[in-house]
Each structure stands twice: as C-alpha cells, then as structure tokens.
Amino acid sequence: MSPLFSIITVTYNAEKVLERTLRSVAEQSYARIEYIVIDGASTDGTMEMVTSYKSQSPGLVRFEVISEPDKGLYDAMNKGLRVATGDYVWFLNAGDTLQSPETVARLAEVAERNGMPDI
C-alpha cells in the first residue's frame, strides 16, 4: 500500500501568508495525505481561511484542525505529532509551499521503490 503522509502546519495569526500553504497542500495529486493544522488561537482571519480550505479539500484522507492556546512553536509541533498517523511526517510552515502538485507523489514513489526507508 502507498505510504500515508502527515503534513503538519503550525500557525498563529498567519492570515496574510497561509493561503498559499493551504492551496499547495490541497492541490497535491497524491491521494494519501492527512493534513494537520495546529493553530495557537489566532485572532485574525486564520481560522476562517483554514475552515474554508477544509471544506474544499475532500481529496485528503484527513484534514485535522486544532485551534487552542499553546506554549509556543515546539508545543504546537508536538501537538501535531501526537495526532499524526502517517508513515511519514512533514512540517510545512505557514507561508511555505510544496514545489508542485506532484511533490508528495514523487516522494511516495521514491519511498516505495526503496522499501519505505526513513527520510
């Protein structure tokens, strides 16, 4: 079976930069992606944007959103790791993007071809 990729994005008041990140995940051609957004209780429009993308992303295996105060970046990252179920975990920062719609598919192909190594 093809590997499941958990992509985790940690946010806090990232409304101005987050859309391109969400779009790059939603546009992936690879079907076995769970996307986890950990938000530190943003006060801008971050959560509205995330909620909108969640409803527009039926192709993802799972789209998990947690929005609550945290104790900083590493606490938020650890929250994401605790809920991730993928064979591979990828942190994609708010404002960053996946290079192309084929990025995860290419990684999955290499992983499968090489016996699912740690990468």
Question: Where do the protein language model's features map onto the residues?
Answer:
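Nucleotide-sugar donor-binding/catalytic module of glycosyltransferases
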Residues: 1-119
